[in-house]
């Protein structure tokens, strides 16, 4: 009888993460668990981990050797995702958190918080529909971040990024925790697409291409600076028009290809992990980490703008200038700024109203 009791106790301890429980009901207390995971590294939380972006994002972050502890939070289905990913034989320890009542527990002590939470734009849904839902979600999550891990680097993926990053900034300002260096909108997917599409035109490996993409993260606010491509290359006006249009419309291209069954989830997860990995290397102290991101900026007259930034231990260490633009890029930039300004104001007004 004692042997059976011991076996049951061991099974209960091992399976403790499979379903959400109150701390006083759990056989294995949080204080008994490994504090930083199986390896030395950083503590990362994904808010919206059970969604279309969140699941592949969580899987890829579990594979990152710089992550020691991975917290997965969502309002539904977190136990299943946590159980599945926790079976991967990589160093990071995975813990799941389900529902609003466990949000703060998911955030305490985190070094990096990634926010893919929200709904994707679906056929028939207007931008206002998308904004009204996701704005409230981002507001709630950022209020908890301000309370539980105000020093964390925050990567915002939830669309519309042009508005949700200003929303996050206003929430942090109200809480007295705002540090513009630590708040970054993830525009890496635009860079990834630009590298891929340019490589297709040139007939080269996309890993050998680097295209800076500035402005914002929607439609004409996405401005690839093809004149600054590395390695240096010139394009015909027809090629510039084709590449710019395809990069700006990469999202709708995927939505159309999926025939209403989803949006760009896998490529977004890949891009988000690529950017998160850059942030973690910078937190570790690696030098020369430069990526494009949507941040509080003085590059233009707008309060937020996507451009190349140098990352460091505190987040954004330096915002790099735009560099020389050709006539096409200057004209496109002026168009982008008008739309971007309206999106920024919409986000700020959502909090201040």
From Swiss-Prot:
Record InterPro entries: L-lactate/malate_DH, Lactate/malate_DH_C, Lactate/malate_DH_N, Lactate_DH/Glyco_Ohase_4_C, Malate_DH_AS, Malate_DH_type1, NAD(P)-bd_dom_sf
Source taxon at top rank: Eukaryota
Compartment list: Glyoxysome
Location (main, coarse): other
GO molecular function terms noted in the UniProt entry: L-malate dehydrogenase (NAD+) activity
One GO cellular component term: cytoplasm
A biological process term (GO) from this entry: glyoxylate cycle
Top-level enzyme category: oxidoreductase
Binding sites annotated in the UniProt record for NAD(+): 48-54, 74, 134, 157-159, 268
Positions with a binding annotation for substrate: 121, 127, 159, 193
EC number(s) recorded for this UniProt protein: 1.1.1.37
CDD domains in UniProt: MDH_glyoxysomal_mitochondrial (cd01337)
Transit peptide: 1-33
Entry keyword set: Glyoxylate bypass, Glyoxysome, NAD, Oxidoreductase, Peroxisome, Transit peptide, Tricarboxylic acid cycle
Gene3D superfamilies in the record: Lactate dehydrogenase/glycoside hydrolase, family 4, C-terminal, NAD(P)-binding Rossmann-like Domain
Active site as annotated: 217
Catalytic activity, as annotated: (S)-malate + NAD(+) = oxaloacetate + NADH + H(+)
Subunit relationships: Homodimer.
Matching NCBIfam families: MDH_euk_gproteo (TIGR01772)
Family membership noted in the UniProt record: Belongs to the LDH/MDH superfamily. MDH type 1 family.
PANTHER family: MALATE AND LACTATE DEHYDROGENASE, MALATE DEHYDROGENASE 1, PEROXISOMAL
Protein name: Malate dehydrogenase, glyoxysomal
Lineage: Eukaryota, Viridiplantae, Streptophyta, Embryophyta, Tracheophyta
